[in-house]
Amino acid sequence: AQFYGKSQNYTQIPRKWYKKYGVKRGLRNEDKTGVLIGLTRIADVVGYKIDDEGRKCDAEGELYYRGISVEDMVSSSKNVKNLYEEASFLLLFGYLPTEADLHKYSARLKDGYELPGGFLENHILRYPGKNLMNQLQLGILALYNYDKNPDDTDVYKTLVKGIDIMAKMPSLVCYAYNAKQHYYGRESLVLHYPKREYSTAENILSMLRLDGSFTEEEAHLLDVMLLLHADHGGGTNSTFANVVVSSTDTDLYSSIASSIGALKGP
């Protein structure tokens, strides 16, 4: 403590230096607008507008995926039970899926719902965690060892790996929560397998509830929430962390784990 207190005399950087040398304080400019870190055609978050005098003004929030408003997606979609699946297809491939496209894509997700054999017992139940974000990091990193070629960064193969990770997210999150509540909350441990006939939202609700029950309204609400959180562009800390880490040509599991670490911060 003594050394730490004294060290403060040698570590402070005057705020005026940031302006003098044009250094950004985090991912914000001085006027509180976002720092431009790259270009994307995937997602666009509109949280403010610039008036005629160049001042930043708060605006009604808008979110676009591939140029399509999420409000329009929710209101016009024919796939009432698979909004998240439809949105993730759009984000990954750049266009809205046909009914046949969505069916094939959803089937691919369903193929990856379940965790590898022994994963639940060895990586989740044996080592329950106090924080779900840390557990999710560990879970993602552990999946690396179940991949036959985890360090292959070919674009197409990375896409396939990413879809498989997406498919397993409900199981990773829900089982980590169940283990935490059992070990730290002293609650009964009841586990449900993901069901192939369920969507991502439906499986999350089913796996979290002791009796596995949920209403259509609950499933639809969670489906919309998943859609809204599917992508927020490149200006968030978690996405930025992924951009930095993946630029080293590391494996996908390490990149995603770094994003989760950044996302955990308040």
Predicted regions and their residues:
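Hydrophobic alpha-helical bundle cores within soluble ligand-binding/oligomerization subdomains
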Residues: A1-P266
